[in-house]
């Protein structure tokens, strides 16, 4: 049996329309499941999310409890995998002070899932008055946190990644 490959054009407007429909016609909890599953590193996540949404429009808010359906159970597994990895990183992530004046903290991670934004909220609260960067080397992204609480996630250029790798070669650990 051969697999078909599809070329799908993405549209921000259509994406937002679908996400709004999930919140309004299924539930906010189903929306949160979808948002967590989107960042999964699983190659089949698109099909799992699609099947979950399809069941959601049929079952409504009860879809998040309908794990008797394999498609919903698969979604639950994806979400749990993303959450577990985020929690593990929250527990073990350590920063190095790579610049002293002003102090800049850096942590380099390589998670399976694209969880750097999930980590940002936790560490923004914990290190609110610090400048820090959480660099996800696998997904070529980083969280940049300014002292005082403002943060952003960005895709990095090759030059930015090289600079972060150079900064990471310093020694002091700060946790």
Positions of PLM-derived features:
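Extended, well-folded catalytic/binding cores that form a central cleft or groove in large enzyme
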Residues: 1-175
């Amino acid at each position: 049996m051969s697999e078909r490959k599809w070329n799908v054009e993405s549209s921000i407007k259509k994406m937002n329309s679908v996400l709004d429909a999930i919140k309004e016609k299924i539930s906010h909890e189903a929306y949160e499941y979808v948002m967590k599953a989107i960042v999964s590193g699983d190659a089949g996540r698109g099909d799992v999310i699609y099947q979950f949404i399809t069941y959601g429009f049929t079952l409504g808010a009860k879809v998040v409890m309908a794990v008797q359906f394999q498609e919903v159970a698969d979604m639950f597994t994806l979400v749990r995998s993303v959450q577990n990895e985020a929690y593990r990183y929250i527990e073990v992530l350590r920063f190095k002070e790579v610049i002293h004046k002003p102090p800049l903290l850096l942590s380099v991670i390589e998670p399976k899932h694209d969880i750097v934004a999930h980590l940002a909220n936790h560490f923004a609260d914990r290190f609110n008055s610090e400048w820090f960067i959480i660099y996800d080397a696998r997904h070529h992204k980083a969280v940049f946190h300014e002292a005082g609480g403002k943060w952003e996630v960005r895709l990095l250029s090759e030059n930015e990644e090289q600079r972060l790798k150079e900064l990471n070669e310093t020694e002091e650990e700060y946790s």
